[in-house]
Amino acid sequence: MKQTDPNNLRIPALKLLLELMPEGAQAGIWTFGRYVNNIVPVAEVDGVWREQAKKAAVNISSLGLQTNLSGALNDAAWGLSADSGFQQSIILLTDGKLDMAKAGAADAEQINAQERKKLMSQVLEKYRVAGANVHTLALSDLADKDLLQEIALETDGLYSEAQDAESLMKAFLRAFDRAVPADQVPMVDNTFVIDDSVNEYTALIFKHSESTQETAILTPSGERWSELKHPKSVRWHQDIRFDLITIKQPEAGTWIAEANLDPSNRVTILSDLALKVDGIPATIFPGDKLDVEITLTNNGDVLDKKEILSLTDMSITVVTASGLEGSKVLSDPESPPVDGVYREGLNRLKELGQYQIDVIAKSRTFQRKRSFATTMIKPVEITHGFDEVKGVYRIEVKGLSDNLDVESSRVIAKIKSPDDNTIIQSVAFDEQAQAWVGNIEVNKGPGQYRVDLNVRGVTQSGRSFKIKPEAIIFDLPIRSASAESDIADQTIVDSETARKDTVAETEVS
Protein backbone atom coordinates (compact mmCIF):
# COMPACT_ATOMS: atom_id res chain seq x y z
CA MET A 1 0.00 0.00 0.00
CA LYS A 2 2.97 2.35 0.39
CA GLN A 3 3.27 2.54 -3.37
CA THR A 4 -0.40 2.53 -4.39
CA ASP A 5 -1.80 4.64 -1.53
CA PRO A 6 1.10 6.72 -0.16
CA ASN A 7 -1.28 9.31 1.33
CA ASN A 8 -3.50 6.75 3.08
CA LEU A 9 -6.57 7.86 1.14
CA ARG A 10 -8.24 4.57 2.01
CA ILE A 11 -8.76 6.01 5.50
CA PRO A 12 -11.21 8.78 4.45
CA ALA A 13 -12.83 6.24 2.10
CA LEU A 14 -13.36 3.89 5.03
CA LYS A 15 -14.66 6.75 7.18
CA LEU A 16 -17.27 7.48 4.51
CA LEU A 17 -18.54 3.90 4.73
CA LEU A 18 -18.61 4.13 8.52
CA GLU A 19 -20.77 7.24 8.33
CA LEU A 20 -23.09 5.60 5.79
CA MET A 21 -23.46 2.40 7.83
CA PRO A 22 -27.09 2.14 8.95
CA GLU A 23 -27.96 2.07 12.64
CA GLY A 24 -28.67 -1.45 13.87
CA ALA A 25 -26.39 -3.17 11.35
CA GLN A 26 -23.58 -5.46 12.51
CA ALA A 27 -20.09 -4.52 11.29
CA GLY A 28 -16.38 -5.03 11.93
CA ILE A 29 -13.02 -4.15 10.35
CA TRP A 30 -10.00 -6.37 9.63
CA THR A 31 -6.56 -5.43 8.32
CA PHE A 32 -4.08 -7.96 6.97
CA GLY A 33 -0.53 -8.38 5.77
CA ARG A 34 1.07 -11.64 6.82
CA TYR A 35 -1.12 -11.57 9.92
CA VAL A 36 -4.79 -10.65 10.29
CA ASN A 37 -5.90 -8.06 12.84
CA ASN A 38 -9.53 -7.48 13.80
CA ILE A 39 -9.08 -3.79 14.64
CA VAL A 40 -12.82 -3.23 15.15
CA PRO A 41 -14.74 -6.25 16.50
CA VAL A 42 -18.13 -7.07 15.02
CA ALA A 43 -20.84 -5.25 16.95
CA GLU A 44 -24.08 -3.37 16.44
CA VAL A 45 -23.62 -0.05 14.67
CA ASP A 46 -24.48 2.95 16.83
CA GLY A 47 -22.85 6.26 17.70
CA VAL A 48 -20.32 4.69 20.09
CA TRP A 49 -19.30 1.97 17.61
CA ARG A 50 -18.96 4.55 14.84
CA GLU A 51 -16.59 6.73 16.88
CA GLN A 52 -14.47 3.72 17.94
CA ALA A 53 -14.25 2.57 14.33
CA LYS A 54 -13.17 6.01 13.09
CA LYS A 55 -10.43 6.17 15.74
CA ALA A 56 -9.20 2.70 14.75
CA ALA A 57 -9.24 3.63 11.06
CA VAL A 58 -6.75 6.45 11.65
CA ASN A 59 -4.14 3.89 12.73
CA ILE A 60 -4.32 1.79 9.55
CA SER A 61 -0.79 1.49 8.16
CA SER A 62 1.02 0.12 5.11
CA LEU A 63 3.57 -2.00 6.98
CA GLY A 64 2.40 -5.44 5.84
CA LEU A 65 4.82 -7.10 3.41
CA GLN A 66 2.64 -10.09 2.49
CA THR A 67 -0.98 -10.63 1.50
CA ASN A 68 -2.86 -13.16 3.60
CA LEU A 69 -6.12 -13.11 1.65
CA SER A 70 -7.23 -16.57 2.76
CA GLY A 71 -6.57 -15.79 6.43
CA ALA A 72 -8.41 -12.47 6.28
CA LEU A 73 -11.50 -13.92 4.63
CA ASN A 74 -11.43 -16.93 6.95
CA ASP A 75 -11.42 -14.72 10.05
CA ALA A 76 -14.09 -12.39 8.64
CA ALA A 77 -16.36 -15.40 8.04
CA TRP A 78 -16.70 -15.95 11.78
CA GLY A 79 -20.34 -15.55 12.78
CA LEU A 80 -21.76 -15.77 9.27
CA SER A 81 -24.92 -17.84 9.09
CA ALA A 82 -27.63 -18.55 6.55
CA ASP A 83 -30.27 -17.75 9.19
CA SER A 84 -28.64 -14.58 10.55
CA GLY A 85 -31.50 -12.37 9.43
CA PHE A 86 -29.01 -9.96 7.83
CA GLN A 87 -27.87 -9.36 4.27
CA GLN A 88 -24.25 -10.41 4.86
CA SER A 89 -21.43 -8.83 2.88
CA ILE A 90 -17.68 -8.33 2.99
CA ILE A 91 -15.88 -5.51 1.18
CA LEU A 92 -12.32 -6.64 0.43
CA LEU A 93 -9.66 -4.13 -0.64
CA THR A 94 -6.14 -5.14 -1.64
CA ASP A 95 -3.33 -3.99 -3.89
CA GLY A 96 -1.40 -7.24 -3.75
CA LYS A 97 -1.38 -10.88 -4.75
CA LEU A 98 -1.98 -13.80 -2.42
CA ASP A 99 1.47 -14.29 -0.90
CA MET A 100 2.23 -16.35 2.20
CA ALA A 101 5.73 -17.59 1.34
CA LYS A 102 8.76 -16.09 3.04
CA ALA A 103 10.95 -13.89 0.90
CA GLY A 104 13.29 -15.97 -1.25
CA ALA A 105 11.70 -19.30 -0.32
CA ALA A 106 12.46 -21.99 -2.89
CA ASP A 107 8.97 -23.46 -2.55
CA ALA A 108 7.16 -20.10 -2.69
CA GLU A 109 5.12 -21.04 -5.74
CA GLN A 110 3.93 -24.27 -4.13
CA ILE A 111 3.05 -22.57 -0.83
CA ASN A 112 1.01 -19.86 -2.53
CA ALA A 113 -0.73 -22.41 -4.77
CA GLN A 114 -1.80 -24.34 -1.67
CA GLU A 115 -3.10 -21.13 -0.06
CA ARG A 116 -5.06 -20.32 -3.19
CA LYS A 117 -6.59 -23.79 -3.27
CA LYS A 118 -7.52 -23.49 0.41
CA LEU A 119 -9.14 -20.12 -0.24
CA MET A 120 -11.24 -21.29 -3.18
CA SER A 121 -12.26 -24.71 -1.84
CA GLN A 122 -12.56 -24.17 1.93
CA VAL A 123 -12.78 -20.51 2.89
CA LEU A 124 -15.22 -19.36 0.20
CA GLU A 125 -17.41 -22.37 0.94
CA LYS A 126 -18.26 -20.70 4.27
CA TYR A 127 -19.57 -17.67 2.39
CA ARG A 128 -21.52 -19.76 -0.09
CA VAL A 129 -23.21 -21.76 2.68
CA ALA A 130 -24.08 -18.57 4.58
CA GLY A 131 -25.29 -16.80 1.44
CA ALA A 132 -22.78 -14.00 2.05
CA ASN A 133 -21.28 -11.84 -0.70
CA VAL A 134 -17.66 -10.75 -1.03
CA HIS A 135 -17.30 -7.50 -2.96
CA THR A 136 -13.68 -7.22 -4.10
CA LEU A 137 -11.78 -4.06 -4.93
CA ALA A 138 -8.43 -4.11 -6.75
CA LEU A 139 -6.31 -1.05 -6.00
CA SER A 140 -4.02 -0.60 -9.04
CA ASP A 141 -2.69 -3.14 -11.55
CA LEU A 142 -0.48 -4.68 -8.85
CA ALA A 143 -3.46 -6.54 -7.41
CA ASP A 144 -4.30 -10.10 -8.47
CA LYS A 145 -7.32 -9.10 -10.56
CA ASP A 146 -8.06 -12.63 -11.77
CA LEU A 147 -8.25 -13.96 -8.21
CA LEU A 148 -10.38 -11.05 -7.02
CA GLN A 149 -12.76 -11.63 -9.93
CA GLU A 150 -13.00 -15.31 -8.98
CA ILE A 151 -13.76 -14.46 -5.34
CA ALA A 152 -16.51 -12.04 -6.36
CA LEU A 153 -17.94 -14.50 -8.90
CA GLU A 154 -18.00 -17.41 -6.45
CA THR A 155 -19.88 -15.36 -3.83
CA ASP A 156 -22.17 -13.30 -6.11
CA GLY A 157 -20.18 -10.21 -5.21
CA LEU A 158 -19.14 -7.13 -7.18
CA TYR A 159 -15.61 -6.83 -8.59
CA SER A 160 -14.31 -3.27 -8.98
CA GLU A 161 -11.03 -1.59 -9.84
CA ALA A 162 -9.52 1.66 -8.61
CA GLN A 163 -6.50 2.57 -10.68
CA ASP A 164 -5.30 5.06 -8.09
CA ALA A 165 -6.05 6.17 -4.56
CA GLU A 166 -8.00 9.18 -5.82
CA SER A 167 -10.70 6.95 -7.35
CA LEU A 168 -10.77 4.65 -4.33
CA MET A 169 -13.56 6.42 -2.44
CA LYS A 170 -16.09 6.12 -5.25
CA ALA A 171 -15.11 2.49 -5.88
CA PHE A 172 -15.71 1.81 -2.18
CA LEU A 173 -19.08 3.50 -2.53
CA ARG A 174 -20.14 1.24 -5.43
CA ALA A 175 -19.31 -1.82 -3.33
CA PHE A 176 -21.16 -0.36 -0.36
CA ASP A 177 -24.26 0.19 -2.50
CA ARG A 178 -24.25 -3.53 -3.29
CA ALA A 179 -23.73 -4.45 0.36
CA VAL A 180 -26.28 -1.98 1.75
CA PRO A 181 -28.77 -1.16 -1.04
CA ALA A 182 -30.93 1.92 -0.48
CA ASP A 183 -33.52 3.99 -2.28
CA GLN A 184 -32.47 7.35 -3.64
CA VAL A 185 -34.21 10.36 -5.13
CA PRO A 186 -32.82 11.66 -8.46
CA MET A 187 -30.40 14.57 -8.13
CA VAL A 188 -30.07 16.91 -11.13
CA ASP A 189 -27.66 19.86 -10.98
CA ASN A 190 -27.56 19.42 -7.18
CA THR A 191 -31.36 19.83 -6.97
CA PHE A 192 -33.66 17.14 -5.59
CA VAL A 193 -37.28 16.72 -4.54
CA ILE A 194 -38.39 15.23 -1.22
CA ASP A 195 -41.99 14.07 -0.79
CA ASP A 196 -43.96 13.82 2.45
CA SER A 197 -43.48 10.03 2.68
CA VAL A 198 -39.72 10.44 3.27
CA ASN A 199 -38.81 9.94 6.94
CA GLU A 200 -35.12 10.72 6.55
CA TYR A 201 -32.62 11.58 3.85
CA THR A 202 -28.83 11.56 3.66
CA ALA A 203 -27.09 13.78 1.12
CA LEU A 204 -23.54 12.85 0.08
CA ILE A 205 -21.79 15.82 -1.52
CA PHE A 206 -18.25 15.41 -2.86
CA LYS A 207 -15.70 18.22 -2.81
CA HIS A 208 -13.25 18.96 -5.59
CA SER A 209 -9.67 19.08 -4.39
CA GLU A 210 -9.04 22.52 -5.92
CA SER A 211 -12.32 24.03 -4.67
CA THR A 212 -12.76 26.25 -1.61
CA GLN A 213 -16.56 26.41 -1.90
CA GLU A 214 -18.46 25.81 1.32
CA THR A 215 -21.16 23.17 1.07
CA ALA A 216 -24.61 24.40 2.05
CA ILE A 217 -28.18 23.13 1.85
CA LEU A 218 -31.14 25.31 0.84
CA THR A 219 -34.48 24.11 2.25
CA PRO A 220 -37.81 24.38 0.39
CA SER A 221 -38.81 27.21 2.76
CA GLY A 222 -35.65 29.19 1.93
CA GLU A 223 -33.39 28.51 4.92
CA ARG A 224 -29.66 28.04 4.32
CA TRP A 225 -27.85 25.43 6.38
CA SER A 226 -24.10 24.79 6.55
CA GLU A 227 -21.70 22.73 8.63
CA LEU A 228 -21.34 25.70 10.99
CA LYS A 229 -25.02 26.63 11.14
CA HIS A 230 -27.76 24.03 11.09
CA PRO A 231 -30.51 22.70 13.39
CA LYS A 232 -29.53 20.28 16.15
CA SER A 233 -31.68 17.60 14.51
CA VAL A 234 -29.35 17.62 11.48
CA ARG A 235 -26.24 15.38 11.57
CA TRP A 236 -23.51 17.00 9.47
CA HIS A 237 -20.21 15.19 8.96
CA GLN A 238 -17.56 17.18 7.15
CA ASP A 239 -14.44 15.65 5.63
CA ILE A 240 -11.76 17.15 3.42
CA ARG A 241 -13.27 15.23 0.47
CA PHE A 242 -17.00 15.17 1.17
CA ASP A 243 -19.93 16.38 3.29
CA LEU A 244 -22.50 13.92 4.59
CA ILE A 245 -25.75 15.48 5.79
CA THR A 246 -28.55 13.48 7.43
CA ILE A 247 -31.92 15.12 8.04
CA LYS A 248 -34.80 13.44 9.88
CA GLN A 249 -38.42 14.29 9.02
CA PRO A 250 -37.35 16.61 6.19
CA GLU A 251 -39.63 19.28 4.79
CA ALA A 252 -41.39 18.22 1.58
CA GLY A 253 -40.45 20.16 -1.53
CA THR A 254 -37.42 21.10 -3.63
CA TRP A 255 -34.00 21.12 -1.94
CA ILE A 256 -30.78 22.52 -3.38
CA ALA A 257 -27.18 21.70 -2.49
CA GLU A 258 -24.84 24.66 -2.90
CA ALA A 259 -21.72 22.71 -3.78
CA ASN A 260 -19.51 21.43 -6.56
CA LEU A 261 -21.35 19.51 -9.26
CA ASP A 262 -20.25 15.88 -9.20
CA PRO A 263 -21.96 12.88 -10.87
CA SER A 264 -21.44 10.89 -7.67
CA ASN A 265 -23.39 13.34 -5.49
CA ARG A 266 -26.53 11.56 -4.33
CA VAL A 267 -29.39 11.52 -1.84
CA THR A 268 -30.49 8.28 -0.15
CA ILE A 269 -33.79 8.10 1.69
CA LEU A 270 -35.81 6.13 4.22
CA SER A 271 -39.43 5.81 3.14
CA ASP A 272 -42.28 3.31 3.12
CA LEU A 273 -42.69 4.09 -0.59
CA ALA A 274 -39.82 2.22 -2.24
CA LEU A 275 -38.51 1.12 -5.62
CA LYS A 276 -37.67 -2.59 -5.83
CA VAL A 277 -35.45 -3.91 -8.64
CA ASP A 278 -34.55 -7.57 -9.26
CA GLY A 279 -32.49 -9.28 -11.95
CA ILE A 280 -29.28 -7.21 -12.00
CA PRO A 281 -26.46 -9.46 -10.73
CA ALA A 282 -23.13 -8.06 -9.59
CA THR A 283 -21.18 -10.09 -12.18
CA ILE A 284 -22.24 -10.70 -15.77
CA PHE A 285 -20.72 -12.30 -18.87
CA PRO A 286 -20.72 -11.38 -22.56
CA GLY A 287 -23.97 -12.60 -24.09
CA ASP A 288 -25.91 -12.64 -20.81
CA LYS A 289 -29.53 -11.54 -20.89
CA LEU A 290 -30.67 -9.68 -17.79
CA ASP A 291 -34.36 -10.14 -17.02
CA VAL A 292 -35.03 -7.04 -14.95
CA GLU A 293 -38.21 -6.73 -12.87
CA ILE A 294 -39.18 -3.42 -11.28
CA THR A 295 -41.94 -2.67 -8.78
CA LEU A 296 -43.05 0.20 -6.58
CA THR A 297 -43.89 -0.95 -3.07
CA ASN A 298 -45.66 0.67 -0.13
CA ASN A 299 -44.85 -0.92 3.22
CA GLY A 300 -43.59 -3.92 1.24
CA ASP A 301 -46.76 -4.39 -0.80
CA VAL A 302 -46.58 -4.04 -4.59
CA LEU A 303 -48.43 -1.03 -5.97
CA ASP A 304 -50.60 -2.16 -8.87
CA LYS A 305 -53.31 0.50 -8.92
CA LYS A 306 -53.78 1.82 -12.42
CA GLU A 307 -54.53 5.36 -11.23
CA ILE A 308 -51.06 5.51 -9.62
CA LEU A 309 -49.00 3.67 -12.26
CA SER A 310 -50.58 5.54 -15.17
CA LEU A 311 -49.20 8.76 -13.68
CA THR A 312 -45.72 7.30 -13.08
CA ASP A 313 -42.88 7.45 -15.59
CA MET A 314 -40.53 4.46 -15.27
CA SER A 315 -37.20 4.41 -17.09
CA ILE A 316 -33.91 2.52 -17.13
CA THR A 317 -30.48 3.88 -18.10
CA VAL A 318 -27.35 1.85 -18.83
CA VAL A 319 -23.85 3.38 -18.94
CA THR A 320 -20.99 1.20 -20.21
CA ALA A 321 -17.41 1.15 -18.96
CA SER A 322 -16.36 3.46 -21.80
CA GLY A 323 -19.14 5.95 -21.04
CA LEU A 324 -21.66 5.03 -23.75
CA GLU A 325 -25.18 5.64 -22.47
CA GLY A 326 -28.59 4.33 -23.45
CA SER A 327 -32.01 4.94 -21.90
CA LYS A 328 -35.45 3.44 -22.36
CA VAL A 329 -38.89 4.43 -21.07
CA LEU A 330 -40.62 1.35 -19.67
CA SER A 331 -43.97 2.86 -18.75
CA ASP A 332 -47.06 3.37 -20.90
CA PRO A 333 -49.71 5.58 -19.27
CA GLU A 334 -52.40 3.92 -21.37
CA SER A 335 -51.39 0.40 -20.38
CA PRO A 336 -49.57 0.09 -17.03
CA PRO A 337 -48.68 -3.48 -15.93
CA VAL A 338 -51.70 -5.19 -14.40
CA ASP A 339 -49.60 -6.91 -11.73
CA GLY A 340 -47.51 -3.80 -11.06
CA VAL A 341 -44.31 -5.41 -12.41
CA TYR A 342 -42.33 -3.61 -15.12
CA ARG A 343 -40.24 -6.11 -17.08
CA GLU A 344 -37.27 -5.40 -19.35
CA GLY A 345 -34.66 -7.64 -20.96
CA LEU A 346 -31.13 -6.29 -21.32
CA ASN A 347 -29.33 -8.47 -23.85
CA ARG A 348 -26.93 -6.32 -25.86
CA LEU A 349 -24.24 -5.87 -23.24
CA LYS A 350 -20.89 -6.90 -24.72
CA GLU A 351 -18.27 -4.45 -23.47
CA LEU A 352 -16.03 -5.73 -20.67
CA GLY A 353 -15.73 -3.63 -17.52
CA GLN A 354 -18.10 -1.99 -15.09
CA TYR A 355 -21.59 -0.83 -16.00
CA GLN A 356 -23.84 1.59 -14.16
CA ILE A 357 -27.56 0.79 -14.34
CA ASP A 358 -30.07 3.32 -13.00
CA VAL A 359 -33.81 2.81 -12.62
CA ILE A 360 -35.90 5.95 -12.05
CA ALA A 361 -39.58 6.35 -11.19
CA LYS A 362 -41.14 9.82 -11.42
CA SER A 363 -44.66 11.01 -10.75
CA ARG A 364 -46.26 14.30 -9.77
CA THR A 365 -46.00 13.46 -6.08
CA PHE A 366 -42.79 11.44 -5.70
CA GLN A 367 -39.48 10.44 -7.29
CA ARG A 368 -37.39 7.34 -6.66
CA LYS A 369 -34.10 5.98 -7.98
CA ARG A 370 -32.07 2.79 -7.62
CA SER A 371 -28.48 2.50 -8.87
CA PHE A 372 -26.50 -0.67 -9.53
CA ALA A 373 -22.91 -1.33 -10.51
CA THR A 374 -22.33 -4.59 -12.36
CA THR A 375 -19.07 -5.87 -13.83
CA MET A 376 -18.76 -7.83 -17.06
CA ILE A 377 -15.85 -10.25 -16.97
CA LYS A 378 -14.47 -12.68 -19.52
CA PRO A 379 -14.39 -16.23 -18.08
CA VAL A 380 -12.62 -17.80 -21.07
CA GLU A 381 -10.06 -16.79 -23.67
CA ILE A 382 -10.49 -17.86 -27.29
CA THR A 383 -7.59 -18.11 -29.71
CA HIS A 384 -7.64 -19.40 -33.27
CA GLY A 385 -5.43 -19.70 -36.32
CA PHE A 386 -4.17 -21.98 -39.05
CA ASP A 387 -1.93 -24.89 -37.99
CA GLU A 388 0.46 -25.33 -40.93
CA VAL A 389 1.93 -28.55 -39.53
CA LYS A 390 -1.41 -30.35 -39.30
CA GLY A 391 -3.07 -28.45 -42.12
CA VAL A 392 -6.12 -27.59 -40.01
CA TYR A 393 -7.69 -24.46 -38.56
CA ARG A 394 -7.30 -24.69 -34.76
CA ILE A 395 -9.69 -23.10 -32.27
CA GLU A 396 -8.82 -23.13 -28.58
CA VAL A 397 -11.09 -22.16 -25.66
CA LYS A 398 -9.20 -21.81 -22.39
CA GLY A 399 -10.66 -21.02 -18.99
CA LEU A 400 -9.09 -17.98 -17.36
CA SER A 401 -9.63 -19.53 -13.95
CA ASP A 402 -8.39 -22.79 -12.52
CA ASN A 403 -11.68 -22.87 -10.63
CA LEU A 404 -13.58 -24.04 -13.71
CA ASP A 405 -15.29 -27.44 -13.44
CA VAL A 406 -14.05 -29.08 -16.65
CA GLU A 407 -16.28 -32.13 -16.28
CA SER A 408 -19.45 -30.05 -16.11
CA SER A 409 -18.50 -27.40 -18.68
CA ARG A 410 -19.19 -27.72 -22.40
CA VAL A 411 -18.14 -26.03 -25.64
CA ILE A 412 -20.35 -26.52 -28.71
CA ALA A 413 -19.30 -25.44 -32.22
CA LYS A 414 -21.65 -24.71 -35.11
CA ILE A 415 -19.58 -24.90 -38.32
CA LYS A 416 -20.80 -23.57 -41.65
CA SER A 417 -18.68 -24.61 -44.65
CA PRO A 418 -18.35 -22.99 -48.12
CA ASP A 419 -21.03 -25.30 -49.54
CA ASP A 420 -23.51 -23.83 -47.00
CA ASN A 421 -23.80 -27.10 -45.10
CA THR A 422 -23.82 -26.75 -41.30
CA ILE A 423 -22.78 -29.21 -38.63
CA ILE A 424 -22.97 -28.92 -34.85
CA GLN A 425 -20.39 -30.74 -32.79
CA SER A 426 -19.00 -30.85 -29.27
CA VAL A 427 -15.45 -29.56 -28.80
CA ALA A 428 -13.30 -31.97 -26.79
CA PHE A 429 -11.23 -30.94 -23.78
CA ASP A 430 -7.50 -31.44 -24.33
CA GLU A 431 -5.76 -32.37 -21.06
CA GLN A 432 -2.33 -31.41 -22.35
CA ALA A 433 -3.41 -27.98 -23.55
CA GLN A 434 -5.82 -27.60 -20.60
CA ALA A 435 -8.32 -26.17 -23.07
CA TRP A 436 -11.15 -27.17 -25.38
CA VAL A 437 -9.53 -27.66 -28.78
CA GLY A 438 -11.28 -27.95 -32.13
CA ASN A 439 -9.49 -28.68 -35.42
CA ILE A 440 -11.36 -27.80 -38.61
CA GLU A 441 -10.20 -29.69 -41.67
CA VAL A 442 -10.46 -28.50 -45.26
CA ASN A 443 -12.84 -31.24 -46.30
CA LYS A 444 -15.59 -29.08 -47.74
CA GLY A 445 -13.47 -27.39 -50.33
CA PRO A 446 -11.87 -23.96 -50.42
CA GLY A 447 -13.81 -20.84 -49.43
CA GLN A 448 -15.22 -19.13 -46.36
CA TYR A 449 -15.88 -20.99 -43.12
CA ARG A 450 -17.86 -19.69 -40.13
CA VAL A 451 -17.73 -21.05 -36.59
CA ASP A 452 -20.22 -20.01 -33.89
CA LEU A 453 -19.26 -21.14 -30.39
CA ASN A 454 -21.57 -21.73 -27.46
CA VAL A 455 -19.70 -21.95 -24.15
CA ARG A 456 -21.52 -23.31 -21.12
CA GLY A 457 -19.29 -23.13 -18.08
CA VAL A 458 -19.68 -24.23 -14.47
CA THR A 459 -17.40 -23.20 -11.61
CA GLN A 460 -16.37 -25.54 -8.82
CA SER A 461 -19.09 -24.02 -6.62
CA GLY A 462 -21.78 -24.74 -9.22
CA ARG A 463 -22.12 -21.17 -10.53
CA SER A 464 -22.97 -21.46 -14.23
CA PHE A 465 -22.52 -19.09 -17.14
CA LYS A 466 -23.25 -19.08 -20.86
CA ILE A 467 -21.47 -17.01 -23.46
CA LYS A 468 -21.76 -16.77 -27.23
CA PRO A 469 -18.61 -15.11 -28.60
CA GLU A 470 -18.53 -13.30 -31.91
CA ALA A 471 -18.42 -15.64 -34.90
CA ILE A 472 -15.01 -16.80 -36.14
CA ILE A 473 -14.86 -16.32 -39.91
CA PHE A 474 -11.90 -17.41 -42.06
CA ASP A 475 -11.01 -18.55 -45.57
CA LEU A 476 -9.37 -21.87 -46.45
CA PRO A 477 -6.88 -22.74 -47.75
CA ILE A 478 -4.69 -20.19 -45.99
CA ARG A 479 -1.44 -19.35 -47.73
CA SER A 480 1.69 -20.17 -45.79
CA ALA A 481 4.07 -17.43 -44.75
CA SER A 482 6.60 -18.55 -47.42
CA ALA A 483 3.92 -18.47 -50.10
CA GLU A 484 2.87 -15.00 -49.01
CA SER A 485 6.54 -13.94 -49.17
CA ASP A 486 6.92 -15.36 -52.70
CA ILE A 487 3.82 -13.47 -53.83
CA ALA A 488 5.11 -10.27 -52.26
CA ASP A 489 8.51 -10.71 -53.96
CA GLN A 490 6.85 -11.38 -57.31
CA THR A 491 4.69 -8.28 -56.87
CA ILE A 492 7.81 -6.18 -56.26
CA VAL A 493 9.53 -7.67 -59.34
CA ASP A 494 6.43 -7.07 -61.49
CA SER A 495 6.21 -3.53 -60.18
CA GLU A 496 9.87 -2.87 -60.90
CA THR A 497 9.53 -4.26 -64.44
CA ALA A 498 6.48 -2.11 -65.05
CA ARG A 499 8.36 0.95 -63.79
CA LYS A 500 11.32 0.26 -66.14
CA ASP A 501 8.94 -0.22 -69.04
CA THR A 502 7.35 3.13 -68.27
CA VAL A 503 10.74 4.85 -68.06
CA ALA A 504 11.83 3.23 -71.32
CA GLU A 505 8.68 4.35 -73.06
CA THR A 506 9.23 7.87 -71.75
CA GLU A 507 12.81 7.95 -73.03
CA VAL A 508 11.79 6.66 -76.46
CA SER A 509 9.09 9.26 -76.83
Residue locations for each model-derived region?
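Surface-exposed, short loops/turns at beta-strand junctions within beta-sandwich domains
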Residues: 248-251, 347-354, 440-449
